[in-house]
């Protein structure tokens, strides 16, 4: 409300195929999870904090699963192939067969490594970077899908007792909506009316304002069409990028036609 946080949402987490949660416990603002996949057991931590970085060199709060950091050691660069090769198994000590991997440099630029067909061979991902990156600090982790679905864009009214109800005596025809975001990278807006789905990509910093190699983050407003009956429309925000995503406001416009009036 007025771009101030007034309520948290309920969340659902999916840790992917073949992952079993053995135990979970919260300490302070962190949850520790004991998990198991086909290659062994391991522990993960989830932080319930905003604007939090795990290392001082982290360029921004990276949204990555199983996030680690290390410097690329000498001897990783091949002059013949003009690339730098890094094997992740020595750093993780745990095998991971599935998932797209992101490697982010301290300046904010990131490299994407899609999951190969059939998964990572032997659960030991090996990453090849163009050029010589020896001595460069990387932040590495697995991509995950962030998905937020807005509640229905309906007219709310408050009675004398302070209760809130939905105005449902007429038809609300939506025209457009918008989201306000702060210090945010790329994301996708999905609009579904039950019969068709429309995708609108937001690229982060506007074209012409960004610099190559710098984080593409922006604070702005994005407007998009939402046509049809408000009851049938669903609006969802989706992102698989490691960049921050902070939605601080939302609004909509439409035409309301009241079918009946009280006497």
Which residues are covered by each model-predicted region?
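Beta-sheet repeat architectures centered on beta-propellers
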Residues: 1-263
């Amino acid at each position: 409300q007025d771009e101030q946080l007034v309520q948290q949402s309920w969340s659902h987490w999916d840790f992917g195929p073949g992952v079993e949660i053995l135990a979970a416990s919260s300490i302070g603002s962190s949850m520790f999870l004991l998990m198991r996949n086909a290659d062994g057991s391991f522990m993960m931590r989830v932080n319930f904090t905003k604007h939090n970085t795990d290392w001082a060199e982290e360029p921004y709060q990276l949204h990555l699963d199983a996030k680690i950091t290390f410097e690329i050691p000498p001897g990783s660069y091949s002059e013949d192939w003009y690339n730098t090769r890094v094997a992740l198994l020595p750093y993780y000590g745990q095998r991971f067969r599935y998932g797209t991997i992101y490697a982010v440099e301290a300046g904010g630029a990131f490299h994407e490594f899609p999951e190969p067909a059939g998964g990572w061979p032997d659960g030991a991902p090996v990453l090849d970077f163009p050029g010589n990156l020896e001595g460069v600090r990387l932040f590495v982790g697995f991509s995950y899908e962030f998905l937020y679905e807005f509640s229905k864009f309906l007219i709310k009214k408050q009675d004398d007792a302070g209760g809130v109800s939905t105005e449902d005596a007429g038809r609300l025809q939506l025209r457009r909506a918008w989201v306000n975001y702060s210090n945010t990278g790329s994301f996708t807006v999905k609009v579904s009316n039950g019969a068709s789905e429309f995708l609108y990509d937001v690229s982060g910093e506007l074209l012409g304002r960004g610099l190559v190699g710098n984080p593409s983050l922006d604070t702005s407003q994005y407007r998009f069409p939402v046509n049809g009956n408000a009851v049938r429309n669903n609006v969802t925000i989706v992102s698989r990028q490691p960049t921050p995503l902070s939605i601080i406001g939302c609004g909509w416009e439409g035409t309301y036609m009241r079918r009946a009036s009280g006497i």
